[in-house]
C-alpha cells in the first residue's frame, strides 16, 4: 500500500476532508476522538501556511488519488519548516506516512459509513463484516475480529468501527442476507464483549478506559461522529488545551505494511417497478 493511493469513495471522502476547520496543535490528542471529524490538525504544527500546505496536499490526495510517494513530493517544499528533516530520514518517512494514512483512512471510513448506513441501503444490506487488513505484523485482536458479522446497528460498531488505531487498515464489508448465506451463516454473530483497560497519558494526565485492541483515542465511530457533527453544525470546533508538547520518539516504530484494500462497491437500491403502459 505504501506506493499506492488508498481506494476512496471520492465524493464522501472529499466532503469529509473539506468540512474540517484547521486547528494548530502540539500533540495529536490535543483534539480527542470524535473531535477529529471537525478539526484538521497535524501534531506539532501550528495554524498557518505550513498547516494549510499539508492540508492542501492531503486534499489533493483525496481528490485525485495521490499516492504516498506523490504526497511526499508535495510536502518537500514544507519539510524544512515542518522540522521533520532535523530528526532524520527515518523519522521523516514515518511522520509523512502516518499523516497520509491516518487522514485518508479516516476519510475513507467516514465515506464508506455514509454509503453503508444510508436508510435505503440498510434495508437491503443490513449486515457488516469486519475485515482485517492482512498486515504482516497484525494486532491479535484485529485478526481475531476478522470475519465477524454484525447488524449495521449493533452497538459494538460505536467503538469498534475501523480504523482502530495507528496504522490500522481494517475495514468493513457490507453484506446482504444472500451474502450471509453464501458464507455459511443464517444470522449475524454475537458481538464480542468489550473489555476495557485503564490508560493515563504521562504528559497531559488525561485518563480513559480504552477497549482492549484499540489505541487510546480511537474508540469511536468516525462515520457516525461525522453524521453527528453535521446534525449539529453550530457545535464548537475543539480547541487544543495548553499541554506541554510530547517528547519526540527517538526511534519511531515502523508502521505495518498494509495491502491495498478495494473500496466496497456503492450499494444502490433497485428502481421501483414501473406501472404498465
Task: Locate predicted features.
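Domain-core detector
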Residues: 1-165, 175-277
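Extended alpha-helical oligomerization segments
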Residues: 169-173
Amino acid at each position: 500500500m505504501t506506493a499506492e493511493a488508498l481506494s476512496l469513495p471520492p465524493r464522501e471522502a472529499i466532503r469529509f476532508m473539506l468540512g474540517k476547520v484547521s486547528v494548530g496543535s502540539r500533540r495529536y490528542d490535543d483534539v480527542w476522538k470524535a473531535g477529529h471529524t471537525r478539526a484538521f490538525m497535524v501534531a506539532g504544527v501550528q495554524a498557518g501556511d505550513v498547516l494549510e500546505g499539508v492540508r492542501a496536499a492531503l486534499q489533493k490526495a483525496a481528490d485525485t488519488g495521490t499516492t504516498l510517494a506523490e504526497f511526499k513530493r508535495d510536502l518537500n517544499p514544507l519539510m524544512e519548516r515542518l522540522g521533520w528533516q532535523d530528526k532524520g530520514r527515518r523519522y521523516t518517512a514515518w511522520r509523512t506516512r502516518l499523516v497520509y494514512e491516518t487522514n485518508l483512512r479516516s476519510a475513507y471510513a467516514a465515506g464508506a459509513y455514509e454509503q453503508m448506513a444510508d436508510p435505503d441501503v440498510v434495508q437491503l444490506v443490513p449486515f457488516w463484516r469486519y475485515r482485517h487488513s492482512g498486515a504482516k505484523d497484525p494486532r491479535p485482536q484485529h485478526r481475531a475480529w476478522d470475519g465477524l458479522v454484525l447488524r449495521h446497528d449493533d452497538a459494538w460498531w460505536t467503538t469498534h468501527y475501523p480504523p482502530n488505531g495507528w496504522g490500522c487498515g481494517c475495514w468493513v464489508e457490507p453484506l446482504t442476507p444472500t451474502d450471509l448465506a453464501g458464507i455459511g451463516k443464517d444470522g449475524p454473530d454475537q458481538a464480542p464483549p468489550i473489555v476495557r483497560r485503564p490508560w493515563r497519558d504521562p504528559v497531559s494526565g488525561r485518563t480513559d478506559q480504552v477497549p482492549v485492541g484499540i489505541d487510546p483515542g480511537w474508540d469511536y465511530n468516525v462515520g457516525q461522529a461525522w453524521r453527528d457533527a453535521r446534525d449539529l453544525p453550530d457545535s464548537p470546533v475543539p480547541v487544543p488545551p495548553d499541554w506541554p508538547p510530547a517528547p519526540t520518539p527517538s526511534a519511531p516504530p515502523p508502521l505495518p505494511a498494509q495491502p491495498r484494500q478495494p473500496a466496497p462497491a456503492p450499494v444502490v437500491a433497485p428502481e421501483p417497478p414501473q406501472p404498465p403502459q
